[in-house]
């Protein structure tokens, strides 16, 4: 995983599905960004099985080092927004704060999905607050493929 938010979301989804990753010998490790993947893998004991989850624009870094890479398009937030649907996401987020951002000239006329994506990413506090809420609201049958596959394959 690139960051702590990926870990939080994956652990939450696994827990909701009744999985105990620790007892299964699975550890979700945020590496502090895609640039660290080569160094991270080099520091592992030989034979350690590693799966990667990353954003689309950084997949090439993971694929240089790992065979088992799962790519979020364009990123984790995008996967969650699409899986939940715009209306459900709007039920979860602070509509007043989101509406304020929508009034910015750069946001006018942009698709709602892209506005939500931008709004979630524009504040680390907001990002870390809402990603777990979005994952909690997600129907387990609708887990986005990269998240499902990194946990269940």
PLM region descriptions:
Residues 1-153:
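Acidic, divalent-metal-binding catalytic cores of TOPRIM
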